[in-house]
């Protein structure tokens, strides 16, 4: 029978509930337990797919094509269990499901209310999400409840968790509360009152936390922990200090050293083997002791909010671990390149253009592509970054001066990149779309396997085929591919059913390392294994730095 750990947050948002939940999962997995995680989001949006990156940050895409919260990316990076659509749900999905049932008559004419109908539906979604785990029936399901205790949006989720813990009985569920202990510089001390009030708020709705994770910019002294314990009615050894760390991969060891996994296992009556965190220690050791260094420029329009590129940043960090290289990322606003030129790129060892949507800043990204191609600087284009590389090549090499994407210019006569109107989903069903289709849930989403052209750089990196995740509406237009190939561009991978270009590259006679991919490889990178594409990219950046005579 699956046991549940509910993770809540207090005082302020963005304390790191996702990292805390993922770190606990990593420790429990190292003890031989099968673990899955769920994220419950209190917003009314059905999913984050149409939300602004400035509002929500990155949209993480699962293997089965769900657009989910970025915390699911942390979950996959910390444990071996893969996430699915059922691992993340929102208030919007809950109400949508309940209203659909009401319209069908499932409630037999009863008045539909938050309690019991909404809370029952939340519990059903939680149990369904746990049961869908790719690891089989999990021993433990860790359920992260988004938002902050006291928010009206979170109340139905907290009530559902309370009811569920009561229904499951003792030793089947426990609560971990993450809260802030701020340091007040003028007083020169940490203040525990916000944590006391947060726990009181939780107790008012019937939830008694078993563990407090106290976030601070420094380790919390024992006397402050005793005070928190006394006022919150939580045992002193269960008041755990979580201070700022320079790497999230240090958090599992930090929590284990303070006995978090022991407390959870005792509360849930689990008797697994001892934790083995040697892998995490080895990763941190490599991360902190690089042998060389490179600087990679990430050219985008969301650079003021790096959460928009969370998985990409982590993928580069994983590559740094597996190449013993410190990777410095410089965030470059593509709109500034449009006005100030590309001089700010000249010191870079490599250029990366990530995915994105909309016309704003695209000409600046194209300028970055042109600079990388002409200067023989390693270039990696992801999703939109590949499309813009093709547009730049079409304009400046092939001579199609009006080449563009219909996303930016619907009337362009040279539609090098255009809307996909028909494709097959993961189940082999034909999906169709037009310019008038809804934005939500109408992209090509999820994993798709495709063969790689022999003799290409793509084959050197991936092998015979590639299986990566997608999130896009537009594709390179096959009508222009013969002209692009005549100019030297190589389409190194295509989808097997629709023959859509998946990867492009330039031959080494034209450029040492120039690759574009239509998919999002960052979603499958993990600190354990890294990712072959990002590893190759960092190695190319190193080679470029050494070729320029700069000490790596």
UniProtKB/Swiss-Prot annotation:
The gene is pyrG. One of its GO terms (molecular function) is ATP binding. Catalyzes the ATP-dependent amination of UTP to CTP with either L-glutamine or ammonia as the source of nitrogen. Regulates intracellular CTP levels through interactions with the four ribonucleotide triphosphates. The keyword Transmembrane does not apply. It catalyses: UTP + L-glutamine + ATP + H2O = CTP + L-glutamate + ADP + phosphate + 2 H(+); L-glutamine + H2O = L-glutamate + NH4(+); UTP + NH4(+) + ATP = CTP + ADP + phosphate + 2 H(+). Keywords: ATP-binding, Glutamine amidotransferase, Ligase, Magnesium, Metal-binding, Nucleotide-binding, Pyrimidine biosynthesis. Belongs to the CTP synthase family. Residues 295-547 form the Glutamine amidotransferase type-1 domain. CDD domains: CTPS_N (cd03113), GATase1_CTP_Synthase (cd01746). Residues 1-270 are annotated as: Amidoligase domain. This is CTP synthase. UTP binds at residues 13, 191-196, 227. Allosterically activated by GTP, when glutamine is the substrate; GTP has no effect on the reaction when ammonia is the substrate. The allosteric effector GTP functions by stabilizing the protein conformation that binds the tetrahedral intermediate(s) formed during glutamine hydrolysis. Inhibited by the product CTP, via allosteric rather than competitive inhibition. ATP binds at residues 14-19, 71. The active site is at 383 (nucleophile), 520, 522. One of its GO terms (biological process) is pyrimidine nucleobase biosynthetic process. Its EC number is 6.3.4.2. L-glutamine binds at residues 356, 384-387, 407, 473. Homotetramer. CTP binds at residues 13, 151-153, 191-196, 227. SUPFAM superfamilies: Class I glutamine amidotransferase-like, P-loop containing nucleoside triphosphate hydrolases. It is an enzyme of class 6 (ligase). Mg(2+) binds at residues 71, 144. CTPSs have evolved a hybrid strategy for distinguishing between UTP and CTP. The overlapping regions of the product feedback inhibitory and substrate sites recognize a common feature in both compounds, the triphosphate moiety. To differentiate isosteric substrate and product pyrimidine rings, an additional pocket far from the expected kinase/ligase catalytic site, specifically recognizes the cytosine and ribose portions of the product inhibitor. One of its GO terms (cellular component) is cytosol. HAMAP family: PyrG. Pathway: Pyrimidine metabolism; CTP biosynthesis via de novo pathway; CTP from UDP: step 2/2.
């Amino acid at each position: 029978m699956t046991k549940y750990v509910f993770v809540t947050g207090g005082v302020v948002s963005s304390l790191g509930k996702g990292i805390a939940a993922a770190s606990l999962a990593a420790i429990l997995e190292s003890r031989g337990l099968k673990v899955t995680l769920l994220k419950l989001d209190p917003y009314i949006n059905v999913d984050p797919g149409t939300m602004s990156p400035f509002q929500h940050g990155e949209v993480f895409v699962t293997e089965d094509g769900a657009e989910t919260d970025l915390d699911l990316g942390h979950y996959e990076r910390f444990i071996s269990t893969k996430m699915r659509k059922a691992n993340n749900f929102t208030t919007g999905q809950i109400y949508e499901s309940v209203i659909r049932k009401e319209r069908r008559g499932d409630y037999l004419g009863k008045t539909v209310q938050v309690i019991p109908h909404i809370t029952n539906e939340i519990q059903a979604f939680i149990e369904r999400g746990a049961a869908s785990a790719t690891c089989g029936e999990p021993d433990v399901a860790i359920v992260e409840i988004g938002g902050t205790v006291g928010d009206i949006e979170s109340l139905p989720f907290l009530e559902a968790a309370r009811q569920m813990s009561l229904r499951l009985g003792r030793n089947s569920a426990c609560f971990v509360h993450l809260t802030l202990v701020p340091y007040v510089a003028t007083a020169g001390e940490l203040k525990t009152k916000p944590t006391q009030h947060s726990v009181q708020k939780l107790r008012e709705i019937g939830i008694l936390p078993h563990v407090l994770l106290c976030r601070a910019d420094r380790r919390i002294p024992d006397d402050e922990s005793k005070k928190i314990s006394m006022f919150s009615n939580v045992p002193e050894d269960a008041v755990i200090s979580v201070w700022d760390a320079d790497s999230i991969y240090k958090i599992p060891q930090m929590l284990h050293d303070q006995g978090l996994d022991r407390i959870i296992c005792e509360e849930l009556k689990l008797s697994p083997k001892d934790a083995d965190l040697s892998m995490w220690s080895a990763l941190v050791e490599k991360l902190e002791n690089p042998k060389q260094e490179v600087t990679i420029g990430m050219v985008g329009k969301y650079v003021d909010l790096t959460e928009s590129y969370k998985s990409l940043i982590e993928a580069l960090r994983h590559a740094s671990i597996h190449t013993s290289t410190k990777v410095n990322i410089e965030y470059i606003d593509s709109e500034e390149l449009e006005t100030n030129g590309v001089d700010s790129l000249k010191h870079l060892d490599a250029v990366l253009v990530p995915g994105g949507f909309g016309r704003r800043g695209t000409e600046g990204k194209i300028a970055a592509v042109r600079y990388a191609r002409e200067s023989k600087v390693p270039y990696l284009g992801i999703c939109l970054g590949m499309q813009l590389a093709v547009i730049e090549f079409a304009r400046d090499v092939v001579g199609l001066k009006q080449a563009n994407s219909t996303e930016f210019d619907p009337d362009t006569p040279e539609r090098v990149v255009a809307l996909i109107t028909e494709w097959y989903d993961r189940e082999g069903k034909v999906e169709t779309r037009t310019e008038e289709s809804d934005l939500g849930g109408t992209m090509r989403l999820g994993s798709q396997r495709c063969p790689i052209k022999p003799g290409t750089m793509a084959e050197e990196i991936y092998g015979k085929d590639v299986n990566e995740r997608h999130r896009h509406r537009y594709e390179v237009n096959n009508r222009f591919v013969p002209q692009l190939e005549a100019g030297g561009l190589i389409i190194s991978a295509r989808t097997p059913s629709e023959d859509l270009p998946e990867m492009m590259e330039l031959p080494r006679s034209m450029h040492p390392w120039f690759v574009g991919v239509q998919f999002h490889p960052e979603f499958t990178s993990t600190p354990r294994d890294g990712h072959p594409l990002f590893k190759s990219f960092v190695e190319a950046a190193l080679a470029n730095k050494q070729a320029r005579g700069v000490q790596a």
